[in-house]
Amino acid sequence: EQIARGRHIANSFCASCHSTTNELPLTGGLDLGKDFPMPLGTFVSANLTPAGPLKDWSDGEIFRAIRNGIDRDGNVLFAMAGARGRNLSDADIEAVIAYLRSQPAVVNDTPLPLDQYGPLALILVGAGMIPEPEPPTDAAIAMPAKGATAEFGAYILSYQDCVLCHGADLTGGEPGQLAPVGPSLAVVRGWTMEQFITTLRTGVDPSGHALNNQLMPWQNIGRMDDDELAATYAYLTGLPSLVAQQPK
């Protein structure tokens, strides 16, 4: 059951970065730097199968990388430090680790170091113009009871990377942010729950607009089960910042 839970999270979350096909296995090789609005360097996702570097890491070191974006040598992992996976519950991170250990080893050599900062990135870091990662934490995180509730939806939104594109309050991203600028999610309040789930399962919204998976990873998010998607809908439709906006 733990491995199955970890596989589910890997398939609906981790694979959007750690796979060039958006699918399992998590062989890495995707240059996340190509999605940035400016040339900051190359930031290649690691091969997370037992053929990759994690075979030499302890479970605790993998846990720290997910929770705090720090590798076994104490170096900051640029993409992981800014990602939301740090908000996965302790039990869910342990489930992901159990799944990672269970994967078949698939060879996919990736460049080392994975993070290679370009000149512009070094200038921006030196000038304090790239946001600092959140400070490391060892605080425990518990997952609320699973169900089609806004509370469980809040947990899902805490670790899915929606805010990176759609803004801290999900009312729309800001020009100049590192992630693609996403629109306000107030539009969801004009959809039924069935339309919301269908959009994330098919990549086509109720107006017939096709979502670009490179900008909006609906293929991965749509692999969440019905309760998870219903919980996400319940959370979004009741979020005060979105209630204050009219659906467009």
Annotate each language-model stretch with its function:
Residues 1-10, 25, 122, 126-158:
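Electrostatic cytochrome c docking/interface patches
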Residues 6, 13-21, 62, 96, ...:
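The canonical Cys-X-X-Cys-His
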Residues 7, 22-61, 77-89, 117-127, ...:
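Gly/Gly-Pro-rich "capping" loops immediately C-terminal to redox-active cysteine motifs
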Residues 11-42, 68-75, 103-107, 158-181, ...:
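Periplasmic/extracellular electron-transfer cofactor-ligation site
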Residues 16-26, 98-123, 152:
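Acidic (E/D-rich), amphipathic helical modules within compact regulatory domains
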Residues 55, 109-125, 143-158, 205-206, ...:
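Hydrophobic transmembrane alpha-helix bundles
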Residues 58-71, 84-110, 194-197, 201-205, ...:
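C-terminal capping alpha-helices of c-type cytochrome domains
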Residues 136-152, 170-174, 184, 228-229, ...:
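Short flexible/disordered coil segments
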